[in-house]
């Protein structure tokens, strides 16, 4: 059974009454499976990696926002120049939490979002302000920290609402991420995507690489392998069926690619999660 590192708020918050703090990781090294007694919002500001989160596995890259709750188990792996801005908070210490909770996903709502580059730039400025104020213990700084945090939550939420209302307002790069997520089990043709959105293939490839430090093919492969790993640990489907569901018609090739990423065969990976 995998050991889980337990992280306490005592190690991160400046005082027992402090409601919020900021922990920036530039760069984030691989970090073992852990849980903590506080909530966390993680904003990926650069690079990429794989996020192991409870029973699911996802690739993460620039623009991802993760809402981690107290007690969640998670870790980072396969990191490549990964920069994280972590906002740690304790709901029971937030006087504005009755308002804030309306802007935080809960229960079965999606807890992993994407924001565009414009929003990411705006957030960087707010997080820098929050980092300064959250390290102070006077009452005015604690109140200001809550106000800045609320502004951050609203900005992220508003961005999602605007993008949901008008697909045309989503940046072309975000449209590409959406298309890739819908292509895990089938072929993805970049030329067709670019023709549909009136884009130059070379330009899309260049911008994607600048934003994620990965090629489009590398990102799609990570998506497929993460989906496969999630299915292996949560279902009894055969390796061959999972390979097909994740876009690999040849199960032997799938096993080879899987082994290069997870350092074991699909069957060996599954065996780690079988209850004895």
From Swiss-Prot:
This is HTH-type transcriptional activator RhaR. Keywords: Activator, Cytoplasm, DNA-binding, Repeat, Rhamnose metabolism, Transcription, Transcription regulation. Residues 191-212, 239-262 bind DNA. CDD domains: cupin_RhaR_RhaS-like_N. One of its GO terms (cellular component) is cytoplasm. It comes from Mannheimia succiniciproducens (strain KCTC 0769BP / MBEL55E). Its main location: cytoplasm. GO terms for biological process: positive regulation of DNA-templated transcription; rhamnose metabolic process. Residues 174-272 form the HTH araC/xylS-type domain. Binds DNA as a dimer. It comes from the Bacteria. The gene is rhaR.
């Amino acid at each position: 059974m995998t050991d889980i590192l337990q992280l306490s708020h005592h190690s991160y918050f400046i005082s027992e009454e402090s409601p919020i703090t900021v922990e920036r990781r530039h760069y984030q090294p691989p970090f073992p499976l852990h849980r903590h007694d506080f909530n966390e919002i993680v904003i990926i500001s650069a690079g990429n990696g794989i996020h192991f989160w409870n029973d699911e596995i996802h690739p993460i890259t620039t623009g991802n926002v993760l809402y981690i709750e107290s007690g969640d188990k998670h870790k980072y792996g396969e990191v490549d120049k990964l920069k994280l801005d972590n906002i740690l908070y304790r709901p029971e210490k937030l006087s504005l939490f009755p308002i804030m909770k309306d802007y935080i996903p809960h229960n079965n709502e999606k807890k992993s979002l994407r924001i565009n580059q414009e929003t990411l730039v705006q957030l960087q400025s707010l997080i820098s302000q929050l980092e300064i104020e959250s390290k102070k213990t006077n009452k005015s700084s604690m109140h200001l920290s809550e106000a800045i945090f609320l502004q951050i939550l609203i900005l992220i939420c508003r961005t999602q609402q605007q993008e949901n209302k008008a697909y045309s307002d989503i940046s072309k790069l975000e449209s590409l991420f959406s298309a890739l997520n819908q292509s895990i089990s089938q072929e993805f043709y970049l030329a067709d995507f670019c023709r549909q959105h009136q884009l130059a293939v070379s330009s899309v490839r260049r911008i994607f690489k600048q934003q994620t430090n990965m090629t489009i093919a590398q990102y799609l492969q990570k998506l497929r392998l993460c989906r496969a790993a999630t299915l292996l640990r949560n279902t009894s489907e055969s390796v061959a069926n999972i390979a097909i569901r994740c876009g690999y018609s040849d199960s032997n090739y799938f096993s080879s690619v899987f082994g290069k990423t997870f350092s074991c065969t699909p069957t060996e990976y599954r065996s780690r999660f079988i209850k004895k």
